[in-house]
Design a protein with these regions (language model features):
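A glycine-rich, often tryptophan-bearing local segment used as a flexible ligand/cofactor-contacting loop or short
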Residues: 2-74
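A residue-identity detector for tryptophan
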Residues: 15, 22, 36-38, 79, ...
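Structural recognition of the beta-strand scaffold that forms the well-ordered cores
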Residues: 16, 21-26, 72-73, 98-101, ...
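Secondary-structure transition/capping residues
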Residues: 23, 50, 82, 171-175
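Oxidoreductase and adenylate-handling cofactor-binding alpha/beta cores
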Residues: 39-45, 81, 90-97, 145, ...
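Catalytic beta-strand/loop cores that center a nucleophilic Ser/Cys/Thr
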Residues: 54-135
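Extracellular ligand-binding/catalytic regions of CAZymes and related secreted enzymes
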Residues: 106-178
Length: 178
């Protein structure tokens, strides 16, 4: 549903474009904001389609893609994470977002099962962490974090701390490696 009023959406958009920083975690990328197209276009980059069900939470291999980015400082090249994995209509890479991490779709069962219904949620290119420049502001989205246990995992905590640091202290967007 509509979480913010039109006025609040406009204020948030202006603040972010003027140099603010936004960190979206897990459900920030679902379809609860689908009526706010600016949000989808600038922060998520793709429309949510579904999450896995069968089982709902699965271990998968997360593969880093842009190790030079400050959000990935001290994050290993690959790591295992249990999550309710999301899928989107397309990869946000198509819209020019900086992809920081993707899923190895061979490492889990990307399907949605419910009674006799089964839907394949493979994307081929399946990002789960990405960044974007929005005017003079920055955004990072991580599709992980459904369960509290995610925040007990040292690698995920490091990624979130790095993201917050980049969002607060970065002087320029886009990030250009030295």
């Amino acid at each position: 549903g509509d979480v913010l009023s039109d006025e609040q959406e406009g204020e948030f958009q202006s603040w972010l474009q003027a140099g603010g920083g936004w960190l979206g975690i897990h459900s920030a990328g679902d379809d609860s904001h689908s009526e706010w197209q600016w949000y989808t276009d600038n922060l998520i980059g793709a429309a949510f389609t579904a999450h896995i069900m069968g089982p709902q939470f699965q271990n998968a291999t997360v593969v880093m893609e842009n190790q030079a980015h400050p959000v990935l400082l001290d994050v290993p090249d690959t790591w295992q994470h249990e999550e309710e994995w999301y899928s989107w209509e397309q990869s946000p890479r198509v819209e020019g977002f900086t992809i920081l991490a993707s899923l190895d779709e061979a490492s889990y069962n990307p399907v949605q099962k419910f009674m006799d219904y089964e839907r394949d949620l493979r994307m081929g290119d399946h990002p789960v962490v990405w960044a974007n420049c929005v005017g003079d502001g920055r955004s990072v989205y991580a599709a992980m974090g459904h369960k509290a246990e995610s925040f007990e995992q040292p690698v995920f905590r490091q990624l979130i701390l790095n993201a917050l640091s980049w969002l607060i202290y970065a002087e320029a967007c886009p990030f250009l490696p030295e």
